[in-house]
Amino acid sequence: MSTKQFTLRKARRWPWLAALVVILALVAAFGWWRSHAQAPQVVFGSTLKIHYEPAMAGEQRVIEYINQHIAPDYGLTLEAVGVQDPVQADRAVADGQYAGTIYQHQWWLKQVVDANGFALSTTVPVFQWAFGIYSDRYRSVASLPQGATIVVPDDGANQGQALWLLQRIGLIRLDPAVEPRTAKLKNITGNPHGFVFKELDLLTMPRALNSVDAAIGYVSQFDAGKVPRDKGILFPPAPRTFASQLVIGTPYLAQENIVRLRQAFADPRLQAWLKTTDDPLVKGVLVPVSAQ
């Protein structure tokens, strides 16, 4: 055999070796993909963490009431977990770190999901937050002067609730082409009283009340800011569309203990308690879910 023939035969082995390396790499990659793609999702046990908004102390009381008086009948134990950052909380629910959250209404959830793409679903209306108009200067809405300065929430979902309230009592008109529950200041088409609107974070409103004519927000926030409830000049019935929702990660909705969780929150004993409780963190702050 010549040296030339030996060189050719030796060279011909390399394509086969290269192909073998590629095949082994593909097999390894497929195995990795399969192990990750088929990794089991979170499976919830009978002890479930439920998130609440720490600034809304009554929400914690709701979870604790259900845990003590209702959840045992469904074979569950609930643990209330307070997290201030709403996006962090919703991410934790979507990822299965928490079984659910009760801090938001459907319009806030839509805002969060649209911005972050979380897989979350509303399930059961839990309660409604008392929401109204406060003033340090006037004793009724009718007393608000022409050109009064009114503070509304600076976040889209709750600003819509404030403006819809003003439209329902005839003080402003909103663009009929816009969903009123998500309206913004730019959607005001009629302002016969010449109100001047300012935007503030809900938690800041109580501190600013003495520098404006009126502010619109949640009773719980004004309570937390030590604003007496007699500073409230209008508390209309809370509309169901802004009810707190038990929000669950969409992939987990059919799990046995999540179904039981939904049943526990839908138990009529909760609404009866909300109606009759004397707990100062709940009474007049979180109210039963209305029919409309």
Cite the ranges covered by each PLM segment.
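Beta->alpha turn/N-cap motifs
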Residues: 84-86, 96-110, 127, 201-202, ...
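Short, polar/charged alpha-helical segment
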Residues: 42-77
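Ligand-binding clefts/hinges and TM-proximal coupling segments of bilobed small-molecule sensing domains
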Residues: 29-32, 157-182, 262-292
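Periplasmic-binding protein-like
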Residues: 123-135, 223-268, 283-292
